[in-house]
């Protein structure tokens, strides 16, 4: 009798175990696993807010994406992108320079139509003429920040090679510290730090957006990624496009997220938003004129020869497809 009861109990255990296993298998097959993506990030400022908004508002999750942002310098990010260690990258200028240098890269999304840099100067510098003979800090020679600084100076009649002394000091935090300690006279700084520096008494002498039609931030991928997994790339672009629209339509919440993200005062975040939102891309694309300007900027390094078209460095077909689909739904 006891053996019979034991046998029945074992059968029940096997039955319920089988049911449990079938339930787990059914649930697993029904749930779509999110794509794990590594994204190279160029910085932490307003121009990268669309990427942070996509995280906080779960736009990535909405499209089955698990994105890990990694802060990287362009010198490391571009090789990592080409090798496949990084899936997507945000160094717009470096992506363009890489493409015209022969690397298999394309810009597929633009978050900012123009540069947000302001030339932050010591209080005694009141005009472009006052910059002559002064020390201007840059992040690295040949990088976007260097080329933007040089282009802006040329636009106001200053020869960046002869009339000022440019020194390579590193990232924005270092440039800010050297401004505060008076080791340098000027440096291009992005918001919100440029806004904070103004409140500290520094001058904002020149704004790059007033002189240069250069896109600031965007997203790029390898041609291999776009060929082998266009569906994933489209989901990434779709999430970022929703993020752009959210930022424009939700000022108060965007400011709150921005302030929390960078741990800055809400007033600073609001001032930054009101200035910087004006140069955000309207729909994730960049004009041919802007892309050509980026190509010319790349050629200014003197290392790149030849003629290139916007199609050689960018591919906004995914964005345009999404925009067309959105119009058809309305």
Regions found by a protein language model. Give the residues of each.
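Secondary-structure end/capping motifs
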Residues: 228-305
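Bacterial N-terminal signal peptides that target proteins for export
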Residues: 2-18
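Short, glycine-/small- and polar/acidic-enriched structural segments
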Residues: 35-171, 175-181, 185-191, 202-213
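Pocket-lining segment of extracytoplasmic ligand-binding domains
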Residues: 93-94, 166, 173-262
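Bacterial N-terminal signal peptides
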Residues: 16-27
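Ligand-binding clefts/hinges and TM-proximal coupling segments of bilobed small-molecule sensing domains
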Residues: 144-162, 239-271, 310-312, 322-323, ...
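Sec/Tat signal peptide C-region and signal peptidase I cleavage site
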Residues: 29-33
């Amino acid at each position: 009798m006891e053996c019979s009861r034991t046998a029945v109990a074992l059968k029940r255990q096997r039955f319920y175990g089988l049911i449990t296993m079938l339930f787990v298998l059914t649930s697993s097959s029904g749930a779509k696993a999110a794509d794990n993506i590594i994204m190279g990030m160029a910085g932490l400022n307003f121009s990268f807010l669309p990427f942070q908004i996509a995280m906080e508002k779960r736009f990535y999750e909405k499209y089955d994406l698990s994105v890990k942002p990694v802060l990287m310098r362009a010198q490391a990010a571009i090789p990592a992108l080409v090798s496949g260690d990084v899936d997507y990258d945000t160094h717009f200028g470096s992506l363009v320079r890489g493409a015209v240098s022969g690397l298999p890269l394309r810009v597929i999304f633009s978050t900012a139509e123009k540069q947000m840099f302001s030339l932050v100067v010591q209080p005694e510098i009141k005009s472009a003429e006052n910059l002559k003979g002064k020390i201007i800090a840059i992040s690295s020679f040949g990088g976007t920040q260097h080329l933007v600084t040089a282009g802006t100076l040329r636009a106001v009649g200053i020869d960046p090679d002869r009339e000022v002394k440019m020194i390579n000091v590193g990232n924005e935090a270092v440039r800010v510290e050297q401004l505060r300690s008076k080791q340098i006279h000027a440096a291009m700084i992005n918001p919100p730090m440029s806004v904070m520096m103004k409140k500290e008494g520094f001058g904002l002498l020149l704004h790059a957006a007033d002189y240069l039609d250069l896109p600031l931030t965007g997203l790029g991928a390898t041609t291999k990624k776009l060929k082998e997994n266009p569906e994933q790339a489209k989901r990434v672009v779709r999430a970022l496009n929703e993020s752009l629209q959210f930022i424009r339509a939700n000022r108060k919440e965007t400011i709150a997220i921005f302030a929390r993200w960078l741990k800055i005062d809400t007033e600073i975040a609001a001032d930054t938003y009101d200035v910087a939102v004006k140069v955000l891309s309207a729909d994730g694309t960049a004009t041919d004129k802007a892309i050509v300007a980026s190509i010319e900027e790349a050629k200014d390094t003197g290392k790149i020869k030849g003629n290139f078209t916007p199609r050689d460095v960018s591919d906004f077909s995914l964005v345009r497809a999404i925009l067309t689909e959105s119009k058809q739904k309305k």
